[in-house]
Amino acid sequence: MNRPVLWGAPPAERADAARNRVHLLSTARDMLGEQGPDRLTMDALAERAGLGKGTVFRRFGTRAGIFRALLDDDEHTFQQDVLSGPPPLGPGAAPLERLVAFGRARADFLIDHREIARAALDGSQPIPAGRRTPMSQVHIRMLLGQLSPRPGGLDLDMLTIQLAAALDGPVLLYLSSDELTDAVDSHERRIGQAWQDLVERVCRP
């Protein structure tokens, strides 16, 4: 696996449904910025957006579905940066440089989206669930396969799972807001540096 992978393009939707989706997500973001996640409910979103409750329910299913949709929307932007943005996150840098940059950017993304990620939990799933193989797993496996020389004696498939867990695991998702209030930059730097230390040691030939 050594080519960029597109992580599941969304299915085609009717023009009116697409307009409603964009409007609802924009409205939800406005409400988040003004009131925080606790006040963002299905009923409140329907009222603020000027749409019927049935429309909101069909679009999101549950309150957690609103936050999953917000997370998915931002994930898509992040994926585009990985696939076609400037190096070292995007193409054009050496695989190890891209792996380091990806982990740093991914950790920043998860910390920045910690409130949305927690609100996306619906009680029946341990972490926000997706319909596809986690993007971190796909991308990390691709970059590991491009390393030259390759690390000797390693199971790249299992290493991929371990490295992806270091980024997408519950430790990052459950970092408390109180813990991060005055130290977000410090956490991002420390997690990013720890990721770089890890992959540089593991990927050493």
Question: Language-model segments: what does each one mean?
Answer:
Residues T27-M31, A69, F109, A166:
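Short amphipathic alpha-helical elements of helix-turn-helix/winged-helix folds
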Residues M1-Q35, R39-R48, G65:
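Basic, helix-initiating cap at the start of DNA-binding domains
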Residues G50-F60:
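Short hydrophobic/aromatic patch on the recognition helix
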Residues D72-L99:
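Amphipathic alpha-helical linker/stalk segments
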Residues L32, F67-D74, H113, A117-A120:
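Alpha-helical DNA-contacting segments of helix-turn-helix folds
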Residues V82-G90, R114-S124, P170, Y174-D178:
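Secondary-structure edge/capping motif, primarily at the C-terminal ends of alpha-helices
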Residues Q79, A101, A105-D112, L121-R150, ...:
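Amphipathic alpha-helical packing segments from all-alpha helical-bundle domains
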Residues M1-G8, V138-G153, T160-Q162, A166-P205:
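C-terminal peripheral helix-coil segments that are non-catalytic and often amphipathic
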